[in-house]
């Protein structure tokens, strides 16, 4: 059913994401923030992957937020965009969270928001200040 379809899509995302990160461990990835691009350390890339995957499947969203995301580009062709967002649900663990948009190498997009992680945790994982 519906839930299984979402779970399947999440599985595809997390599997592909992990593969991109593993690949990046050998070749590296780039990080773009505030218009500046730098190379991303494989350890930072792995920490970010663990953080995002540990948060589990969030709430799939039809559109992404305004503003400049923090972008990680993997050599697999996949792109990860992250935004800090407000989580309006009253049941949310935190009033803010992270919006994740993952674009597969084939152009397919999987995007969701989660209150399980915060942008400062993302910055810490990436070694940003």
Predicted regions: what they are:
Residues 1-129:
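Function-determining sites in protein domains
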């Amino acid at each position: 059913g519906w839930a299984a379809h979402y779970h399947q899509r999440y599985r595809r995302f997390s599997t592909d994401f992990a593969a991109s990160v593993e690949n990046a461990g050998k070749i590296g990835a780039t990080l773009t923030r505030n218009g500046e691009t730098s190379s991303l350390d494989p350890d930072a890339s792995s920490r970010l992957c663990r953080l995002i995957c540990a948060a589990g499947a969030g709430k799939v969203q039809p559109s992404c937020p305004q503003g400049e995301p923090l972008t990680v580009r993997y050599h697999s062709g996949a792109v990860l965009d992250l935004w800090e967002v407000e989580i309006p649900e009253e049941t949310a663990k935190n009033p803010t969270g992270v919006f994740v948009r993952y674009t597969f190498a084939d152009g397919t997009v999987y995007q969701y928001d989660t209150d399980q992680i915060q942008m400062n945790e993302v910055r810490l994982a990436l070694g940003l200040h």
